[in-house]
UniProtKB/Swiss-Prot annotation:
It comes from Escherichia coli (strain K12). InterPro entries: Flag_bb_rod_N, Flagellar_basal_body_rod_CS, Flg_bb/hook_C_dom, FlgC. One of its GO terms (cellular component) is bacterial-type flagellum. Signal peptide: none annotated. Its main location: other. It is found in: Bacterial flagellum basal body. The basal body constitutes a major portion of the flagellar organelle and consists of four rings (L,P,S, and M) mounted on a central rod. The rod consists of about 26 subunits of FlgG in the distal portion, and FlgB, FlgC and FlgF are thought to build up the proximal portion of the rod with about 6 subunits each. The lineage of its organism: Bacteria, Pseudomonadati, Pseudomonadota, Gammaproteobacteria, Enterobacterales. It comes from the Bacteria. One of its GO terms (biological process) is chemotaxis. Belongs to the flagella basal body rod proteins family. This is Flagellar basal-body rod protein FlgC.
Length: 134
């Protein structure tokens, strides 16, 4: 594997993890949004990754294939005084799992940091290679 390929692979991972962090942040920001523009509670989103290898290559980077809505059911919270409550007093809340999103955020952040370290290591190796002939 050429060193320049490592830059492409790690760079694609940085982009993918950045998108994952953005989606998790959006989910956390909307965890208490009872209604959206369509009048329904916010639906949590998830990032779907896909291998991004050149044809015939054994290795490759990663890309975000899609951002999908979570199929988890909405949460029901008993608030009989809320104007959005149904006849039984329950309000439909977003299906965001706050703890799961925090774990997802930490995982994406660690993955991002690991890929930055990969880039720094490869850069250091290339600089040392250039000084071998001196």
């Amino acid at each position: 594997m050429a060193l320049l390929n490592i830059f492409d692979i790690a760079g694609s991972a940085l982009t993918a993890q950045s998108q994952r962090l953005n989606v998790a942040a959006s989910n956390l920001a909307n965890a208490d949004s009872v209604t959206g523009p369509d009048g329904q509670p916010y639906r949590a989103k998830q990032v779907v990754f896909q291998v991004n290898a050149a044809p015939g290559a054994a290795t490759g980077g990663v890309k975000v294939a899609d951002v999908i809505e979570s199929q988890a059911p909405d949460k029901l919270v008993y608030e009989p005084g809320n104007p959005l409550a149904d006849a039984k007093g329950y309000v439909k809340m977003p299906n965001v799992d706050v703890v799961g999103e925090m774990v997802n955020t930490m995982s994406a952040s660690r993955s991002y940091q690991a890929n930055v370290e990969v880039l720094n290591t490869v850069k250091s190796m290339m600089l040392k290679t250039l000084t071998l002939g001196q």
